[in-house]
C-alpha cells in the first residue's frame, strides 16, 4: 500500500477555529497497514497527542482491513481534531452493507472482530454510504 498525503480535510459543518483535519490516500498494492498506522501516529504526535495514538492505530488497522476486504479502489484515512475529541474516518470506493452491522466473530478464521474493537475503543462510531463511497468513522474524547 502506498500512502499519499492529501491535504487538510474538507470543510465540515460546525468546524471551529483551532480544529484540524488531515487526510491520507492509500493506494492498495498490498495488504500493508503500516502507512495508515504511521500516518495516524505522526498526525496525533504532531498535535501533541502521541500518548493517545495506540488505540487510534489499532482502530485504523481494523477499519483499513475492512476497506481492503469489503471495499474497492483508493482508501482515504482522515484524522480530525474537533474540540476535545479525535475523529478517525476511513472511506473507500466500495458499497458496504447498509446499515453496517456486526458480524458474528469466528475463532477459526479471525473475522468479525474489527467493528467490535472499534466500538470498544470509541465513544461513538458509525458508517454511511454516499453514491460510490462508504465511510466508517469513530470518535473519542481526549483523555486528560
PLM segments and residue spans:
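STAS-typified acidic loop motif
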Residues: 22-38
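Conserved short strand/loop->alpha-helix "switch" segment adjacent to the catalytic nucleotide/phosphoryl-transfer site
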Residues: 34-61, 107-109
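Conserved beta-strand-loop-beta-strand hairpin that lines the nucleotide-binding pocket
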Residues: 1-23, 68-144
Amino acid at each position: 500500500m502506498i500512502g499519499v498525503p492529501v491535504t487538510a480535510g474538507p470543510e465540515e459543518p460546525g468546524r471551529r477555529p483551532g480544529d484540524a483535519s488531515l487526510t491520507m490516500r492509500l493506494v492498495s498494492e498490498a495488504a500493508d497497514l503500516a502507512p495508515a498506522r504511521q500516518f495516524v501516529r505522526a498526525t496525533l504526535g504532531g498535535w501533541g497527542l502521541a500518548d493517545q495514538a495506540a488505540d487510534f492505530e489499532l482502530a485504523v488497522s481494523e477499519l483499513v482491513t475492512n476497506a481492503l476486504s469489503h471495499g474497492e479502489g483508493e482508501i482515504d484515512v482522515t484524522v480530525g481534531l474537533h474540540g476535545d475529541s479525535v475523529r478517525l474516518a476511513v472511506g473507500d470506493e466500495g458499497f458496504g452493507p447498509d446499515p453496517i452491522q456486526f458480524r458474528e466473530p469466528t475463532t477459526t478464521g479471525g473475522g468479525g472482530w474489527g467493528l467490535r474493537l472499534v466500538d470498544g475503543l470509541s465513544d461513538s462510531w458509525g458508517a454511511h454510504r454516499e453514491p460510490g463511497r462508504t465511510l466508517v468513522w469513530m470518535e473519542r474524547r481526549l483523555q486528560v
